[in-house]
Amino acid sequence: MIVRERYMRLIRDFMDKPVIKIITGMRRSGKSALLELTRQELLDRGVDRKNIIFINFESLRYEALRDYKALYAEIIKIAGQTEGRIYVLLDEIQEVNTWEQVINSLRVDLDCDIYVTGSNAKLLSGELATLLAGRYVEIQVYPLDFDEYLAFAAENEDEAKLSKREQFANFLRFGGLPGIHQLKWDEDRVMQYLHDIYNSVLLKDVIARNRIRDTALLESIVLYLMDNIGNTFSAKTISDFLKSQGRKLSTETVYNYLKALESAFLIHKVVRFDIKGKRILETQEKYYLSDLGLRHAVIGYRDNDIAGVLENTCLLYTSPSPRDRSVSRM
């Protein structure tokens, strides 16, 4: 397994520190692999295998533990059968109802070090922020940058034969989700894989989690975003455009759908900053996609979009977090 060192450095910095490590990011961006690498790091440091509890809530094997009381009881039971510090690694924790109560109770009741992953930004809002204020650190994971892409591609027999120029062209076209490098390198196969992930993110992390009924409207908004990367616009801009296409909707509905897409880490909003007035502007933001491969699986790759594609790429991979960026107005 290839080590994504820039994230593992952060995880190592907080190992055995009294904070909960919360690894967030879009589905299939590599969070589970990082959790597995964390388990291996603990073993390499001499932690007994019996002292590591690893649960992946996407597996039916652990379906009964999606109830927070059952999960708490199971971890307490395992901890009672071992000696020393317990290391709790929980993958896709948002599948557990009121999971934050479990985490807070474990922190209080056990000598433990806790790591969790989640595919929704709402993990860090509401009750969690109240219960764990000052007691957690977020490590947000993005798809592969180009250096990481090259490392993964080197492990794929078909990709390893390509020049760096060809690799970069593929990076812009197919994006940086790690799973594409596990496939036999064929454009149709890769695009089908990416389209399936897009559908999974939209259905599980956006539509189901936010109880969205007008799925056609949501998809229209996503298509608008994909078609306008690199451009400034607002929720009202989208609303006006869709109304011109015969849709009936409010600006507030568009805004809520954009927030749902952000929460699933499918898109990132970058606000405008008025340099002259030194203030944040509340309209005409830019939205960037977490992974360009998803865009091209849905609307196709178009050479005349290269300016927006490169801007999207630079935004993601030259900043620790798109949330720290702004679009300037002179």
Predicted feature locations:
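Pre-Walker A adenine-sensing motif
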Residues: 3-14
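Positively charged, low-complexity/disordered segments
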Residues: 322-324, 328-330
